[in-house]
Amino acid sequence: MKMRAQLPEYVAEVYDPTCGDGGLLRIFGDDVCKYGVEIDGAEAEKARSIPNSMIFAGDTLSKDYFPNIQFDTIIANPPFGIPWAHPTQQPDENKAKHASEIFDNYPTYAPANCADLAFIAHILYKLSDNGAAVCLMGLGALYRGRAEAKIREYLVDRGVFSRIELIRDAQFEDTSIPVAMLTMRKSSQDKSILFVDGEVERRVEYSEIKENGFDLSVNRYVNAEKQEDKWKDFDPYAHEEMIRAKVCENLDESITLSKVLCKIDPCLNPIDDFLDSLQAVINKHRASESSPDNQTTTEDCL
């Protein structure tokens, strides 16, 4: 497995801050102590079946479930692009305290509407001084501007990233999308980064990364033209539009099927209840986007 290959051969313990049902923890032997946190209680319960494990159900960005412990090995595949309650919006003082701690000395917090770099900050907060971490991340975290650009600059200045690989066909449920695999350490004097795209790789010095505004997109540094495959001209913005269209298409099909089932089985809850639930989700996200802290301008895309 690509992620396991980036970690030391001998691992005594491993931590996954967003462990789901424990899929990544299961790649380690029964002799390895496994620690995890998962926000979905049902998924956390499945993960508890893993031998030699300690799993908590909860929000890893709101509480340190393993206080005073730092891990030599961390592996993670956090959800991409989800909102989070950073300290300025967190009414619970204890939860706000942990969110502040993971961003201690950072120039700013991750934006409220995207927790990608908050997960990175948490991973580094829990990583031991000589530890190694590997994490899958959506490609947007590598190039988005404003607050995230400032955080990337801070991380590159600390020598956090040793390797960034473009995984062009990562499997997620029923779809295959490109993601980035980040190999990280607590800090290092070596600020260069090895960028990898399939068989092509290139080590890039700090000065060049700085010239590019701390954009860490693999295709910016690796000669993607040598990669003769369908992804060589990958456009992340067009891809996002395609995903949104697919979500709408799948939702339409699901609603149509649900309407048919309601006609067949009158014991099912009325379709209107389902539609009301969907509308509530839409209204929630419209409200969050309209708040001043989440306003997006043209500058956000630069």
PLM ranges: what are they?
Residues M1-A76, G81-P83, N130, G138-G140, ...:
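Conserved S-adenosyl-L-methionine
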